[in-house]
Each structure stands twice: as structure tokens, then as C-alpha cells.
């Protein structure tokens, strides 16, 4: 601090320095004491879906908000299970997981709706001339992640394209493009924003059928950050600081895809992430998928959530805790909120 009274500065230099030193120490101590930890469990190995968090970390946004972020690795149990079991404060999850959990009595709320438009499609070998449209999938083998919603989606696509909707399934244990090239299945579900690019780079290109093009009600949130109502109640201010810092990171990732890729790779030196794959994926996500209907990033569309819930209930795709069909009149407004966003 600059002194304006010369005599005081001459008479009390030692005292002034001592006070300043004490003040700095106290401020530092308070800052360290005030820092709070937030844990986030990933839905898969680190990839471009998570780059906004890593960019927010690299640019000090969490630190400025008094937060230390702990990234927890993907668990075979699933990120929702880790969250509900108290193993994390936030989890990367999609709308289907939140809704299906609610039907079973598991309470989760999406507080950051990362991707409103789905990039999940049905992959077929690009050189497969026997399959040129969804109707051609009838009776053929489908490699799926196992969710009933995925099978119903394909059946709807086939029927809406003039087929019968006969689907044979096999559990997808590898990437979509690998499954259709190694003969595991005739077609598989996957993400155009990652596996589609990966397939091209591997020299095994695939062609895609997108569910929305064939009358399927698609997810209102391919991915987002979820937490529990209890956490929001007990840590409302911390949750808001965390989400707004995260939102800053994803805004930066939209405007600076290369910076997002650098942050992702620098934070995960032990993870084999191909830079070209990450770069092309990030450019696609930043330019086509992350900007929301509000012109920003992170907002959830409650009306779309409700339409998707109504579709899932009407198709019998939700079960209660006893494994019986759930028709509970679930409300999207109970599962997604924009209240923590800037």
C-alpha cells in the first residue's frame, strides 16, 4: 500500500511492513481455508466431452471461485451409481440415465445440459451395399450398449422406414466401427462425434443413420453434469460456483477448440488420446453440438425433456424399483434446472 503521509511512513516503516506481512499471511490462510473440493466422476475415459472442465482448470476458473476440482475416473458401476452412492459430488451422465433413475426412485438433477442435440447414430460399414436405409436393418444383428431404449430406437427407425422392426441383438463390447468391421454385428450404435472420426482415421469408414431423421424422439441431453437434490440443498453456493466456472470453461472450448484439446491432453498425459482424433472431435462438438437454444452452453430445454419422458413412458421403456413398467407421470421440471447457470 502506498503511504500519502510522509511522516507516518518515516516513523512507522517497520510497523507498516509488519502489518502488511500479517495481512498477507491472513489473506493467504483464509484463501487456503476457504477452498472447497468438488469431485466429478467421468462417464468414460477422458475425451473431448470433458474438455471444458479441463480448460476451466487450466485457466484457473475453479481456483478463482475457491474450488479444487477432483476428477474421478470412469467406473464400471457407472457414473450415476458412483454419484448416488456418495462417491462423487457430480457425474457426467445423459438424460436417459437421469429419467430411468427417477423411475426407479433414484433422485438426480441435471444442472449443466452440455449437449442438447444427439450425436448418437446407427453405424454400418461404408462399403456395405446391402444396407442403404434403416428398413434394410430388419432381421439383422445389432450391436448395442444394452439399454432397452437403444433397441426401441432402432425398431422405430426400421418401422418408420417401411420395415417390420425385427431386431437381433448382441452386446457391444468394442467400438461401433470395430463391431461392424470384425463381423460381430451388421450394425451398431455409436457417436458420430468420436467413433465416426475414429473410424475414418483407422481406414474403416462407416455410414450413419441418425434416429431423428426417422421420427425418433431423441434425448434432450446426450450428456451433462448431474448431482443430487440433497447436494444442491446442502451446498447451494458451492454448486453454483462450480457450475458457473464449468460453464466458462465450455464457453471457452466453443470459441477456442485448440485450447480445449491442449487442456485435455495436458491434464491426461498417461491416457492414450490421439491428438488428430481429439482435434476433429472438438471442432465438431464446438461448432455443431454444444451451443444451446439460449445461444450459450449448458441450458436444458424442459419442454424437450418432457416430450422425451412421455415417449419413454408411452413406449414402456421405464421400470420401477421392482422391474415393473413405470407410468408415474414423471416431470422434466423435477430433473433438470438452469438455476445454477450464469
Locate each region found by the language model.
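Bacterial N-terminal signal peptides that target proteins for export
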Residues: 1-10
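C-terminal motif of bacterial Sec signal peptides marking the signal peptidase cleavage site
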Residues: 17-21
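Bacterial lipoprotein signal-peptidase II cleavage site
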Residues: 22-32
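Short, glycine-/small- and polar/acidic-enriched structural segments
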Residues: 30-173, 177-182, 186-190, 209
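Pocket-lining segment of extracytoplasmic ligand-binding domains
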Residues: 96-97, 175-179, 183-270
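Short, surface-exposed acidic
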Residues: 164-168, 270-282, 319-330
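Conserved C-terminal helix/tail region of periplasmic/extracytoplasmic solute-binding proteins
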Residues: 305-342
Amino acid at each position: 500500500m502506498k503511504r500519502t503521509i510522509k511522516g507516518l511512513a518515516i516513523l512507522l516503516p517497520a510497523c507498516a511492513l509488519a502489518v502488511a506481512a500479517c495481512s498477507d499471511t491472513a489473506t493467504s490462510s483464509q484463501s487456503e481455508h476457504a477452498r472447497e473440493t468438488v469431485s466429478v466422476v467421468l462417464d468414460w475415459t477422458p475425451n473431448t466431452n470433458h474438455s471444458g472442465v479441463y480448460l476451466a482448470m487450466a485457466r484457473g476458473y475453479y481456483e478463482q471461485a475457491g474450488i479444487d476440482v477432483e476428477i474421478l475416473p470412469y467406473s464400471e458401476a457407472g457414473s450415476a451409481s458412483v454419484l448416488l452412492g456418495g462417491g462423487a459430488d457430480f457425474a457426467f451422465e445423459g438424460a436417459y440415465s437421469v429419467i430411468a433413475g427417477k423411475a426407479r426412485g433414484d433422485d438426480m438433477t441435471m444442472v449443466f445440459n452440455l449437449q442438447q442435440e444427439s450425436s448418437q447414430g446407427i453405424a454400418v460399414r461404408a462399403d456395405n451395399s446391402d444396407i442403404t436405409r434403416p428398413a434394410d436393418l430388419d432381421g439383422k444383428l445389432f450391436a448395442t450398449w444394452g439399454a432397452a431404449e437403444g433397441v426401441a430406437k432402432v425398431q422405430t427407425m426400421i418401422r418408420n422406414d417401411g420395415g417390420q422392426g425385427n431386431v437381433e441383438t448382441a452386446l457391444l463390447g468394442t467400438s461401433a466401427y470395430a463391431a461392424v468391421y470384425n463381423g460381430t454385428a451388421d450394425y451398431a450404435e455409436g457417436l458420430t462425434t468420436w467413433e465416426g472420426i475414429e473410424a475414418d482415421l483407422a481406414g474403416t469408414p462407416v455410414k450413419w443413420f441418425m434416429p431423428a431423421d426417422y421420427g425418433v424422439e431423441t434425448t434432450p441431453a446426450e450428456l451433462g453434469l448431474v448431482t443430487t437434490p440433497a447436494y444442491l440443498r446442502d451446498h447451494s453456493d458451492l454448486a453454483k460456483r462450480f457450475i458457473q466456472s464449468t460453464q466458462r470453461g465450455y464457453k471457452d472450448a466453443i470459441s477456442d477448440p485448440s485450447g480445449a484439446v491442449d487442456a485435455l491432453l495436458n491434464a491426461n498425459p498417461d491416457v492414450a488420446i490421439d491428438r488428430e482424433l481429439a482435434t476433429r472431435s472438438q471442432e465438431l462438438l464446438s461448432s455443431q453440438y454444444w451451443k444451446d437454444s439460449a445461444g450459450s452452453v449448458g441450458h436444458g430445454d424442459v419442454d424437450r425433456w418432457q416430450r422425451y419422458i412421455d415417449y419413454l413412458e408411452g413406449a414402456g421403456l421405464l421400470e420401477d424399483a421392482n422391474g415393473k413398467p413405470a407410468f408415474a407421470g414423471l416431470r422434466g421440471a423435477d430433473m433438470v434446472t438452469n438455476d445454477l447457470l450464469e
